[in-house]
Amino acid sequence: MKKRVVILGAGESGVGAALLATRQDYEVFVSDAGKISDQYRAELDSNKIAYEETGHTESYILNADEVIKSPGIPEKAGIIKKIREKQIPVISEIEFACRFIGNSKVIAITGSNGKTTTTALTYHICKHAEMDCAMVGNIGFSFAKQVATDPRELYVAEISSFQLDDIVSFRPDVAILTNITEDHLDR
């Protein structure tokens, strides 16, 4: 029996997770409380991935084996509270993607400021050293989408504080913390 995964949010992160889950033979359903952009709707349709928009069907979501939560969805959202009450595992797209990278390496960059510049510079150095690498995460393709469509030996990942929510076993080979300031204290 296929494992049922529900992905909350149909932006870059959610659609990337849906593509990877589909390629890994999961039963996939994407749910977005808002309207899905034409670009992402076309990707879901062309890959025959089931989805809904402008609302969440709780009976389906609460029957999932696992939920992948997009980083823009706050922990205090009603649907997240219900999922937690049912003790359904909730993970991030970053956590999900790292399950399928095999022996590839990850350089993860996070911090309050300077993530994008540091990620781009690190990627540039690795690329010019002729490493088989991709820039993913909060810049470029989502981590999951890159793993699903064009796997590499090295991933240079910009990871925001929101993308670090629901991390369980993700352990990058190199972690860079640019700095810490009093940002996003409301989450």
Stretches found by the model and what they are:
Residues 1-92, 96:
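N-terminal leader/targeting and accessory segments in enzymes
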